[in-house]
């Protein structure tokens, strides 16, 4: 398929700017970087509860680190596979994907996502990656109705789960709750896919694909993940595979660094959960470097810890390979990046360490639970009387949606998911706390 079709935008542009010689993907990167949705990431913490000092990462600093790792992966692949240089394309494209990958995530992390998904259970559901696709293509006001109006290849790259939610949803056996405080995230996991409300944009992105490629790319299968009832997609584009690897590496390594600095993960936990597995790795580099990395990670000398973090990131980045799936015709689907098996196992061990000792930590789960209550309370209030409580511009979107017979509840999810953690908390206090003051400062923020 010609590269020009992947550089097309949904809405044609005739902007004539003096001496502007940027490539289409450089323009995409600029639009994302200067967007309000991207700026809001600075006020959404990467891991709830670790923000008690100024060292912690936000979703914005995380996205910047993912971008740096993503371009590092591309540079390594370009040297390792010179025949794939044309496919790797622009560094600005990969930066765009990495910078934008978390834009759709709501306040309060997974707690906010589950809460919105529950409140939207009869209206198409909610999921952070689906919301990212929606913001980029429809909501961000760079254009009147086409969002950031990004290139087709950029939109293909952001598709982590390329299928509409209606094809993926499997009804659970759990009854609906009678009280918001009873909501258990494990019983209401979001469907990982595109909202059906955005199926027209999804169709446009996939337009250049052959019938066979599209059918295979959007095919679904039962999930192998325990306690996840919904179906899962099977494939992603080449660009998306690089972005997802960069995200996984940043999550496993940099979030681990945060946890070590704050004393959440200890050297004894490392020796108990990581060392026994990795010392038997089939890769000699992992076996040889393990002890030194473990010692430096928990050193009181900051430069030694940073050296260990750099060694880990470099180890993963240089262990990425390109796989060929000849069942696809389109090169962007035929080729995917992945970690060598031993390094994939090592990365999973680190991710499980972060999940076990950080994400599942009761104090952090309490904050996530609190966020759930805030999000559900806000949604319930706005849904009860949208034309009374929503900001004027959101009221207008809600009315338009109602008049056109569209999903007006999606407008409520759009509004709440765009909030920062702090803004959502203040607005909740404004609505439900008798001691809250004027809402003048609230009206200025969104």
UniProtKB/Swiss-Prot annotation:
Q: Where is this region: Disordered?
A: 1-28
So which domain of life are we looking at?
Bacteria
The alphabetized UniProt keywords are: Hydrolase
List the GO biological process terms: dGTP catabolic process
Which ranges does the record mark as transmembrane? Answer: none
Among CDD domains, the record links this protein to: HDc
A Gene Ontology molecular function term for this protein is: dGTPase activity
Q: Which family would the database say this protein is a member of?
A: Belongs to the dGTPase family. Type 2 subfamily.
Name of the protein in its database record: Deoxyguanosinetriphosphate triphosphohydrolase-like protein
Q: Which organism is it from?
A: Shewanella sp. (strain MR-7)
């Amino acid at each position: 398929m010609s590269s020009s079709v992947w550089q097309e935008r949904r809405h044609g542009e005739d902007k004539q700017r003096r001496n502007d010689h940027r490539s289409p993907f450089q323009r995409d990167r600029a639009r994302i970087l200067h967007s309000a949705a991207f700026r809001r990431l600075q006020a959404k913490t990467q891991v709830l509860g670790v923000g008690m000092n100024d060292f912690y990462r936000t979703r914005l600093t995380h996205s910047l680190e993912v971008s740096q790792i993503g371009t590092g992966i591309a540079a390594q692949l370009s040297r390792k596979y010179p025949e794939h240089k044309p496919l790797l394309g622009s560094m600005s494209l990969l930066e765009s994907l990495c910078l934008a990958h978390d834009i759709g995530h709501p306040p309060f992390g997974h707690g906010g996502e589950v809460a919105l998904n529950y409140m939207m259970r009869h209206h198409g559901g909610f999921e952070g990656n689906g919301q990212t696709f929606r913001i980029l293509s429809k909501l961000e006001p760079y254009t009147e109705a086409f969002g950031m109006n990004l290139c087709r290849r950029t939109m293909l790259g952001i598709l982590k789960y390329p299928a509409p939610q209606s094809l993926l949803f499997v009804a659970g056996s759990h009854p609906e709750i009678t009280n918001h405080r009873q909501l258990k995230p494990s019983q209401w996991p979001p469907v990982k896919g595109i909202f059906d409300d955005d199926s027209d944009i999804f169709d446009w992105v996939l337009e250049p694909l052959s019938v066979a490629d599209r059918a295979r790319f959007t095919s679904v299968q039962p999930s192998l993940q325990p306690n996840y009832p919904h179906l899962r997609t099977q494939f992603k584009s080449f660009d998306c595979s690089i972005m997802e690897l960069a995200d996984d590496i940043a999550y496993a390594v940099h979030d681990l660094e945060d946890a070590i600095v704050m004393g959440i993960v200890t050297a004894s936990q490392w020796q108990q959960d990581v060392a026994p597995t990795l010392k038997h790795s089939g890769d000699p580099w992992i076996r040889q470097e393990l002890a030194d990395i473990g010692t430096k990670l928990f050193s009181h000398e900051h430069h030694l810890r940073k050296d260990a973090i750099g060694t880990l990131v470099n180890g993963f980045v240089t262990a990425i390979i390109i796989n060929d799936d000849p069942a696809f015709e389109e090169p962007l689907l035929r080729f995917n990046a992945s970690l060598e098996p031993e390094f994939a196992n090592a990365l999973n061990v680190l991710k499980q360490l972060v999940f076990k000792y950080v994400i599942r930590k009761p104090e952090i789960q309490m904050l996530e639970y609190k966020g759930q209550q805030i999000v559900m309370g806000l949604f319930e209030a706005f849904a009860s009387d949208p034309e009374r409580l929503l900001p004027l511009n959101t009221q207008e979107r809600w009315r338009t949606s109602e008049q056109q017979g569209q999903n007006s509840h999606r407008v409520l999810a759009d509004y709440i998911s765009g909030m920062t953690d702090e803004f959502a908390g203040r607005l909740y206090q404004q609505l439900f706390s008798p001691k809250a003051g004027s809402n003048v400062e609230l009206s200025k923020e969104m």
